[in-house]
């Protein structure tokens, strides 16, 4: 079973629908116990890092996600969900993240326009990686003003937008996409399908 975490930060319907279409069996939850029990946890999110951390803590989900990660059980973070994996964010201040992947979330400095919104090209570090097999192309959909800075060993793919930033990351069972696979058409669907086969 797959659970999509409801912490009042973003549109859960599009993520849930995309997962259903690919044969996942998603349910939406804000129950910390479910975070520990199910096969895959999906942490979506749109909005401010500070608000996301506050909501996760208030619902008891922050510690549940950290405990799940310590058990090496898979978590997928999408957009803000991915950013929450990192040590801290400098969005409107300085705020601690889940610290599941070492790194910091910072604002674009050289981007032609903020937010980075629309289609852009993924550049896989290794095009033979199972996450990127059978893709019709590498164009995916982004909406964000901040990005993660982390060690290259955790990066599966980069994207360029004024500056190079990690678009897909992995540390053990923790996988993050800065792009929205659920809004990325056939490419996003294939990536989610590949992820299912990896788990």
Curated annotation (Swiss-Prot):
Positions of transmembrane segments: none
Catalytic reaction equation(s): 5-[(5-phospho-1-deoxy-D-ribulos-1-ylimino)methylamino]-1-(5-phospho-beta-D-ribosyl)imidazole-4-carboxamide + L-glutamine = D-erythro-1-(imidazol-4-yl)glycerol 3-phosphate + 5-amino-1-(5-phospho-beta-D-ribosyl)imidazole-4-carboxamide + L-glutamate + H(+); L-glutamine + H2O = L-glutamate + NH4(+)
Entry's EC annotation: 4.3.2.10, 3.5.1.2
UniProt superkingdom: Bacteria
UniProt KW Lyase keyword: yes
HAMAP family recorded: HisH
Identification of the protein by name: Imidazole glycerol phosphate synthase subunit HisH
Organism field: Carboxydothermus hydrogenoformans (strain ATCC BAA-161 / DSM 6008 / Z-2901)
Classification lineage: Bacteria, Bacillati, Bacillota, Clostridia, Thermoanaerobacterales
């Amino acid at each position: 079973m797959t659970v999509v975490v409801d912490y009042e930060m973003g549109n859960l319907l599009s993520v849930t629908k995309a997962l259903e279409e690919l044969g996942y069996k998603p349910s939406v939850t804000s129950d910390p116990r479910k975070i520990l029990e199910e096969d895959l946890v999906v942490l979506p999110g749109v909005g401010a890092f500070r608000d996301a951390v506050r909501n996760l803590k208030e619902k008891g989900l922050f510690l549940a996600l950290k405990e799940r990660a310590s058990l090496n059980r898979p978590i997928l973070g999408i957009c803000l969900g991915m950013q929450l994996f990192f040590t801290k964010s400098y969005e409107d201040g300085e705020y601690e993240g889940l610290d599941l992947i070492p790194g910091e979330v910072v604002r674009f400095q050289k981007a032609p326009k903020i937010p980075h919104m629309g289609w852009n090209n993924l550049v896989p570090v290794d095009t033979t990686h199972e996450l990127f097999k059978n893709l019709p192309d590498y164009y995916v959909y982004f909406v964000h003003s901040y990005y993660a800075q982390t060690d290259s060993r955790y990066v599966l793919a980069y994207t360029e937008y004024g500056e190079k930033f990690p678009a897909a990351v992995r540390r053990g069972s923790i996988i993050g996409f800065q792009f929205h696979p659920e809004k990325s058409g056939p490419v996003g669907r294939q990536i989610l399908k590949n992820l299912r086969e990896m788990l």
